UniProtKB/Swiss-Prot annotation:
Family: Belongs to the PTH family.
Gene3D superfamilies per the UniProt record, alphabetical: Peptidyl-tRNA hydrolase
Organism: Cutibacterium acnes (strain DSM 16379 / KPA171202) (Propionibacterium acnes)
Sites where the protein binds tRNA: Y17, Y78, N80, N126
Active site annotation, chain numbering: H22 (proton acceptor)
Annotated PANTHER family: PEPTIDYL-TRNA HYDROLASE (PTHR17224:SF1)
Superkingdom field: Bacteria
EC identifiers of the protein: 3.1.1.29
Protein name per UniProt: Peptidyl-tRNA hydrolase
The gene coding this protein: pth
UniProt entry keywords in alphabetical sequence: Cytoplasm, Hydrolase, RNA-binding, tRNA-binding
Length: 200
């Protein structure tokens, strides 16, 4: 069965970036894979790691519906080239922008906050900027995880590329799990229902 959705979690590749604020989107993909009992694998010629799986309404507390076939994806490019991988995979799988979900960090939301939206600008986020450029549209769904702004005069780039302190990791883990719930809700129940439930 052809996939009906593509979900990408933005982040930078390699262990150097594991646990950073900028990689929280990729952490959500890892959580969705864990729930599905799946692992990402390199996709030949597409500069991405991905897995095709099925999501159902089992964990959402809503009536059962037909499971949806989705591609869960993490780019193997750096953040500012995310659009290269997204456009390749979307084109290959026949996914249109309205069935693309991009999960990413958002400095204009406080830590722990979650916001779902469709369309809009890139707000200086280089991953979103690259995806918009390569798809030639910003008309895709975003799951935005708040990481907050840096204190004082710290460079925002240094802030998002820093690892989350140990004392905040539990809170971040809760946020990642909630964002994974939100992705499942968008796919099974639709964006409006998911926004009503998860926007904070």
């Amino acid at each position: 069965m052809s996939p009906s959705w593509l979900v990408i979690g933005l982040g930078n590749p390699g262990p150097r970036y594991d646990g950073t604020r900028h990689n929280v989107g990729a952490d959500v993909i890892a959580e969705l894979c864990r729930r599905a009992g799946e692992k990402l694998s390199p996709a030949r010629g597409q500069r991405a790691e991905l897995v095709r799986t099925r999501l159902s309404s089992a964990g959402l507390g809503v009536p059962a519906v037909d499971a949806q076939t989705v591609i869960l994806m993490r780019s193997r490019t750096y953040m500012n080239e995310s659009g290269i991988a997204v456009s390749k995979v979307a084109s290959f799988a026949g996914i249109t922008p309205d069935h693309l979900i991009v999960v990413h960090d958002e400095i204009d939301l406080d830590p722990g906050r979650l916001r779902l939206k469709k369309g809009g600008g890139d707000n200086g986020h280089n991953g979103l900027k690259s995806i918009r450029a390569h798809l030639r549209t910003g008309d895709f769904i975003r799951v935005r995880l708040g990481v907050g702004r840096p204190p004082g005069h710290q460079d925002p780039a240094d802030w998002v590329l820093a690892r989350v302190p140990a004392r905040q990791r539990a809170e971040m883990g809760v946020q990642v799990a909630l964002a994974a719930d939100a992705v499942e809700s968008i796919i099974i129940q639709g964006l409006a229902a998911a926004q009503n439930r998860f926007n904070s």
